[in-house]
Amino acid sequence: MDRIIEKLESGWWIVSHEQKLWLPYGELPHGLAANFDLVGQRALRIGEWQGEPVWLVLQHRRHDMGSVRQVIDQDAGLFQLAGRGVQLAEFYRSHKFCGYCGHPMHPSKTEWAMLCSHCRDRYYPQIAPCIIVAIRREDSILLARHVRHRNGVHTVLAGFVEVGETLEQAVAREVMEESGIKVKNLRYVTSQPWPFPQSLMTAFMAEYDSGEIVIDPKELLEANWYRYDDLPLLPPPGTVARRLIEDTVAMCRAEYD
């Protein structure tokens, strides 16, 4: 699947190492390979954006290496491809040897996988399913400040799906564990690949059922009900959390404005 980059090769360049992206001038490199000193490097074509190929190059640059979060405000499709590149780069870096027999592995030529030529085992990129849910109570939405978010951002509740658990069960458990309340009328909304480090966010909306807010201090700094027209600092546009909040606000406006 990989190839040597030639002088006139052009497109979008995902240059990644250890979950970081090369972002010269704060942007994803776009244009001729020669302009970015990429000629002669090995590259994987991982998609297409605006009619041009998107290439993954497994390489560390001394300067301008940053987080994929820095491109979250770009188009959702390009952010998704950047996230794919970062996750694949880390997958290839961390799967050089077979976890069963210890022999060297090599990339598959037909799919995103690493193969062991000794025991013939096959490894795929790990994807961790998560739930994220906006909870509405009449004209208000439940928003929380997470321990890991010290920047004042308030967002909806989220968490990882456990082994042997359905998405619906995960929503009920996470909401109860983090806030102490029960929800009802759960509705699936959308999903978003989230490369921090390798999650797939499954987004839901739900209605408050019963209980009083009792936060888990290991997870949350605070949680409260906020009226739809008086909200605190929110997650940035482009995140599925922001989408859920905006959808909830729209529903409240339709009923209470």
UniProtKB/Swiss-Prot annotation:
Which residues of the sequence carry a binding annotation for a divalent metal cation 1? 158, 178, 219
Q: Where is this motif: Nudix box?
A: 159-180
Q: CDD domains recorded for this chain?
A: NUDIX_NADH_pyrophosphatase_Nudt13
Write out the residues that bind substrate.
69, 111, 124, 192-199, 241
Domain named Nudix hydrolase: which ranges? 125-248
Q: Which Gene3D superfamilies match?
A: 3.90.79.20, Nucleoside Triphosphate Pyrophosphohydrolase
Annotated signal peptide: none
Q: Where does Zn(2+) bind?
A: 98, 101, 116, 119
**Binding-site residues, a divalent metal cation 2:** 174
EC primary class? hydrolase
The residues that hold a divalent metal cation 3 are 174, 178, 219
A GO term, aspect molecular function: zinc ion binding
Its EC number is 3.6.1.-, 3.6.1.22
Catalysed reactions listed for this entry: a 5'-end NAD(+)-phospho-ribonucleoside in mRNA + H2O = a 5'-end phospho-adenosine-phospho-ribonucleoside in mRNA + beta-nicotinamide D-ribonucleotide + 2 H(+); NAD(+) + H2O = beta-nicotinamide D-ribonucleotide + AMP + 2 H(+); NADH + H2O = reduced beta-nicotinamide D-ribonucleotide + AMP + 2 H(+)
Family (UniProt): Belongs to the Nudix hydrolase family. NudC subfamily.
Per UniProt, subunit arrangement is:
Homodimer.
- Described function: mRNA decapping enzyme that specifically removes the nicotinamide adenine dinucleotide (NAD) cap from a subset of mRNAs by hydrolyzing the diphosphate linkage to produce nicotinamide mononucleotide (NMN) and 5' monophosphate mRNA. The NAD-cap is present at the 5'-end of some mRNAs and stabilizes RNA against 5'-processing. Has preference for mRNAs with a 5'-end purine. Catalyzes the hydrolysis of a broad range of dinucleotide pyrophosphates.
Q: What is this protein called?
A: NAD-capped RNA hydrolase NudC
